């Protein structure tokens, strides 16, 4: 059951500390459920009879969140919110046609879709509509988004990796990541191809045919 974060977490920790074995399975949010590991409230799933090599388990996620050869959380087909919150890139078909741009579907199928193409498309469409040099929500944008922090992941540049013992370490500081951030900086700050607004404003701009691309969780497709 869910009332609020603190009540939810206190219910779990109180049950574990009391040894009453009320809960055997917990569905929680990554941002806070992970703290239960440091409180010794979770069981190592690798010590169970569960076969995590089955197709319905997401090996990429489960391998990444394991610690020192132990697994305390697992993600699989039953985790519907994973799909709902998966970051995707929507594109506006009307603007694609109006500007005579090749569909991203075609470019993906021919292995020609990359960030440089997205950047070129976005910069072609972006326009300071009222010529006030303000570049705000009244203009037309090549791309609107909310979470810039997702960009490094798109370039397969992980924030964190693990050594041979399974110990995680920060892997942010690399020449490749510096190149990624330089590209993103130019795209976002210099070229005005992309802008970050609040989710509601992004949705409005995109629905009004004033954004070519829209980065958002998949669940926004239902809006």
What role is predicted for each listed range?
Residues 2-11, 111-117, 194-207:
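Short helix-initiation/N-cap motifs at beta->coil->alpha
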Residues 2-61, 66, 98, 212-213:
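Extracytoplasmic "Venus flytrap"/periplasmic binding protein-like
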Residues 17, 37-41, 100-101, 120-130, ...:
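Sec-exported extracytoplasmic/periplasmic mature domains
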Residues 33-37, 218-223:
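A ligand-binding cleft/hinge motif common to bilobed small-molecule-binding domains
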Residues 37-40, 61-106, 144-166:
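Periplasmic solute-binding protein
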Residues 119-122, 151, 157-198:
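Glycine-centered hinge/linker elements that transmit conformational signals in sensory
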Residues 128-139:
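Acidic, glycine-anchored loop motifs typical of Ca2+
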Residues 176-190, 202-220:
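Glycine-rich, aromatic-lined ligand/substrate-binding cores of catalytic
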């Amino acid at each position: 059951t869910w009332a609020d974060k603190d009540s939810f977490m206190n219910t779990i920790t109180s049950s574990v500390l009391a040894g009453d074995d009320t809960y055997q399975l917990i569905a929680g949010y990554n941002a806070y459920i992970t703290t239960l590991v440091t409180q010794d409230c979770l069981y190592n799933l690798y010590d169970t009879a569960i076969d995590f090599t089955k197709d319905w388990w997401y090996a990429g996620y489960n391998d990444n969140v394991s610690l020192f050869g132990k697994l305390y959380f697992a993600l699989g087909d039953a985790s519907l919110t994973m799909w709902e919150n998966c970051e995707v890139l929507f594109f506006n078909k009307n603007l694609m046609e109006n500007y005579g741009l090749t569909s991203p579907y075609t470019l993906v199928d021919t292995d020609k879709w990359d960030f440089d193409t997205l950047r070129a498309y976005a910069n072609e469409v972006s326009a300071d509509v009222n010529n006030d040099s303000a570049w705000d929500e009244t203009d037309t944008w090549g791309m609107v988004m909310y979470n810039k922090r997702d960009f490094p992941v798109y370039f397969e540049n992980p924030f964190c990796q693990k050594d041979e013992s399974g110990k995680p370490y920060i892997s942010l500081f690399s020449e490749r990541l510096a190149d990624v951030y330089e590209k993103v900086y130019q795209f976002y700050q210099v070229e005005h191809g992309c802008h970050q607004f609040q989710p509601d404003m992004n949705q409005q701009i995109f629905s009004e045919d004033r954004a070519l691309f829209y980065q958002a969780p998949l669940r926004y497709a239902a809006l």
